[in-house]
Amino acid sequence: SITREINQIAEGLKHAPDEFRGLSKLLADKYFCNFSLFQSLPDSWAIDQIFPIMPIQRLDEKPDRSATLQDITCDSDGKIANFISTRNVAHYLPVHSLKKTEPYYVAVFLVGAYQEILGDMHNLFGDTNAVHVSVNEKGYNIEQIIDGETVAEVLDLSLIHISEPTRRS
C-alpha cells in the first residue's frame, strides 16, 4: 500500500517528519497465536515484563513483516506489543509473511515456572508445550520436552468428562 511505501521511505530519512514517527507501530500486522496471554505470560500484561520472543523457523529468510501478537481468548484482549530490540523496546516483532500451507511458530523464552503458577487455568487453554534447553561450548542439548495438556485433560480438570455420555435437553 502507499502508506507502507511512505513508511519505508520515512524510515530511511535522517530527519523524518514527526508525523511519520509512529507509522510503523500503526502498520504492524496482528498475528493471532494459539495461547492465552493471561495464562502463559501473566507478567507480560500485569507488570509489562518484556520476554525474548522470536520466530523459530525460516531463520534463513529475512523477516518481511512487522507484527504484534494477539491471543485467541474469548475477547482477544491478550496482546504483546513490546519486544526486546537491539537498542530499546520495539513496538512490533519482525516476522515472515504467512504461508497458507504451513504453520508459523514463534517462541517465547525465559518464561519459567513462575509464570505457570501465576497463570493457573485461564479460558480452558491448559498448559502449553514446553522445551528445556541447555547451552554449552559445543552447542545445545534438549534436556526435556513437556507436552501440553489435551482438550480432554483440560475438560477433565473442569469436571467435564468426555468419556461419559452427554445429556441433551
List where the protein language model places each region:
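Conserved, mostly hydrophobic/aromatic
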Residues: 33, 103
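Generic long, charged, amphipathic alpha-helical segments
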Residues: 64-81
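Short, glycine-/Ser/Thr-/acidic-enriched flexible segments
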Residues: 36-40, 74-76, 111-115, 136-138
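Hard-cation-handling environments
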Residues: 1-28
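Short, compositionally biased
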Residues: 118-136
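Single conserved hydrophobic/aromatic residue that forms the stacking wall/gate
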Residues: 160-169
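Short, Lys/Arg- and Gly-enriched loop/turn segments at beta-strand edges
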Residues: 114-121, 141-142
